[in-house]
Amino acid sequence: MKFIILSTILGLAGASATALTAVPIIEKIAPKSKSCPSGNTDCRTAKQAAPFLINAFKDHDIYDPKMMAAVLALMAFESVDFQYKRNQVPGRPGQGTANMQMANYNLLYAKDIPELAPKFEGVDSVEGMSDDDLNKLLDAVTVDKYNFASGAWFLATQCKQDVKDAFKKDVDEGFKLYIEECVGTEVEPRQEVFNVAKEAFGI
């Protein structure tokens, strides 16, 4: 079943039912997510991640298959198919989530989550934070329900409207703008995963 069908039923079915549909497609985009290496406590399988990903798309009103594909492709690339939620190289404190966000975005993200916001009241910048505090911030946003919502949150709140509009005109141009102008990195190594995601979505 294509994700284009999944996007249609997102608003009609419960998250658990929709997640069952999503699992094989997430596994296509992130093939290593079929299982987790023994001893890797950060890793989550597609089956574990699916309900949180589905809820995130619904919560952030992302129903366009092109944008859903882009978010999943980026998260799969950055987290090595959901095996990691903390930056591994060079091991930067505070950088992580399945979206592998820098610490400044994780602070913004935490302050956008009602359950976490009180913990970071009055904290307006990560500058000057100790490594321990940066990692405590990361710990807060890498609980599964927040970890797997990070990609949808980032696209919905941190990307300009012209980036979102670009997906409607040309999916590859939209992805290019998303990666280069919004995420601020190179599109080329991520394009291969996005090509797989497009196939999964039937785009």
What name fits each language-model region?
Residues 85-87, 163-165, 190-193:
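A short secondary-structure junction signal
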Residues 189-203:
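C-terminal helix/juxtamembrane-tail motif
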Residues 1-22, 202-203:
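Fungal secretory targeting signals
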Residues 63:
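Contiguous, function-dense segments enriched for cysteine-driven chemistry
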Residues 145-152, 172-176, 191:
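Short amphipathic alpha-helical surface patches that serve as generic macromolecular interface elements
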Residues 75-79, 163-188:
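Acidic helix/loop microenvironments that form the catalytic cleft of cell-wall polysaccharide enzymes
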Residues 19-52, 57, 66-160:
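Peptidoglycan-targeting cell-wall enzymes and recognition modules
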Residues 154-161, 181-185, 200:
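Hydrophobic alpha-helical segments
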